[in-house]
Amino acid sequence: MSDRTAIIGDVYSAFATGNAERLSTLLGDTDWVEAGGMPYGGRYRGFGEIAANVFGPINTDVQGFNAAPDEIIPAGDDRVLACGTYRGSGAGGEVAAPFAHLWTVRDGRITNFVQYTDTHLFRQALGQ
């Protein structure tokens, strides 16, 4: 496992355990792009905006939310691709939406995140 894939693995571990302090350190000033069709879609900068606009609402809307990747692979000099399935349950039922997350890690720091997912499946689970 490369250093950059280990860093990204650490993000998913911190999210799964609710370790906001670690997430704040890892995501610091990250440029975060949540898919436009998502209820939380948009561009956010830094952990504060990400937590307020994505992490907080998603944990409120989706019981048992889990974004554990099935694989984390290096993709080029400074990119990492994580693929998996979002799981949990919302007002409209269970969610099982595949995702691909493209991360950029430069000099040991996460600089960018872009989300790709089936937003329709996610919205269905929320009853939207």
Which residues fall in each region the model found?
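Hydrophobic/aromatic beta-strand elements that line small-molecule binding cavities or substrate pockets
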Residues: 67-73, 86-87, 98-104
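A short hydrophobic beta-strand element
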Residues: 76-86
